[in-house]
UniProtKB/Swiss-Prot annotation:
Domain EngB-type G residue range list: 26-200
Gene that encodes the chain: engB
Protein name: Probable GTP-binding protein EngB
Pfam families: MMR_HSR1
Domain of life: Bacteria
Protein's job: Necessary for normal cell division and for the maintenance of normal septation.
HAMAP family xrefs: GTPase_EngB
Family of the protein in this entry: Belongs to the TRAFAC class TrmE-Era-EngA-EngB-Septin-like GTPase superfamily. EngB GTPase family.
A GO biological process held by the record: division septum assembly
Record-listed GTP binding positions: 34-41, 61-65, 80-83, 147-150, 176-179
InterPro entries: G_ENGB_dom, GTP-bd, GTP-bd_ribosome_bio_YsxC, P-loop_NTPase
Length: 200
């Protein structure tokens, strides 16, 4: 079966709002993280080839839970983490979903890597670098995806790619992927990288 066909068999399992509601799987998990409004939902819909799998919104900070999606029955679990950095939610709500994120990332036995999205239109913010440093300190592997590349010039894209190369990171997985959910650029490459990670 072709990789895109495998990824398109996507089933929403649960939106977990507390640790006890995390599903108990024994298959590979790959998490998607990023700053609020970076395009996580659009990317999930693009790689699963279904605009309805993840709700998209122009309002930052909409995802306040961890969403679990089962791919192709037993191929893998795609984990949509809440966006960090901006939200009109209460401080208590924000603290809760940040705790959920941290608990999941530190305790999941099946997590292979985090796909970390960076809005290339905005570039790397301090909060992105803080999250990268946290992943590095906790020895969590991650792959960087530059999103919304259709909105910037090649020069700006190259500046961001070179910036990553100069960070001297230890747990980043290459290549850095440049993607546009709108035009499906880089989506095939990302699906391939996901499949390769699971096969290892």
């Amino acid at each position: 079966m072709k990789l895109k066909a495998i990824m398109s068999k996507c089933e929403f399992i649960i939106g977990a709002t507390h640790v006890k509601s995390f599903p108990n799987f024994s298959i590979p998990e790959i998490a998607i993280a990023g700053r609020s409004n970076v395009g996580k939902s659009s990317l999930i819909n693009a790689i699963t080839n279904n605009k309805k799998n993840a709700k998209t919104s122009s309002r930052p900070g909409c995802t306040k839970q961890i969403n679990f999606y089962l791919i192709n029955k037993s191929f893998m679990v795609l984990v949509d983490l809440p966006g960090y950095g901006y939200s009109k939610a209460t401080r208590a709500t924000i603290n809760n979903y940040l705790f959920l994120m941290e608990y999941y990332l530190l305790n999941s036995k099946n997590l292979l890597k985090v796909i970390l999205l960076i809005d290339v239109k905005v570039g790397f913010k301090e909060i992105d670098l803080d999250f990268i440093n946290w992943l590095e300190l906790n020895h969590i592997y991650y792959q960087l995806v530059l999103t919304k590349i259709d909105r910037v010039s090649k020069e700006i894209l190259d500046v961001n790619i070179n910036y990553i190369k100069n960070l001297n990171l230890g747990f980043v997985i290459y290549p850095v992927i440049s993607a546009s959910s709108k035009y499906k650029q880089g989506i095939g490459e990302l699906i391939y990288e996901i499949a390769q990670c699971i096969k290892k």
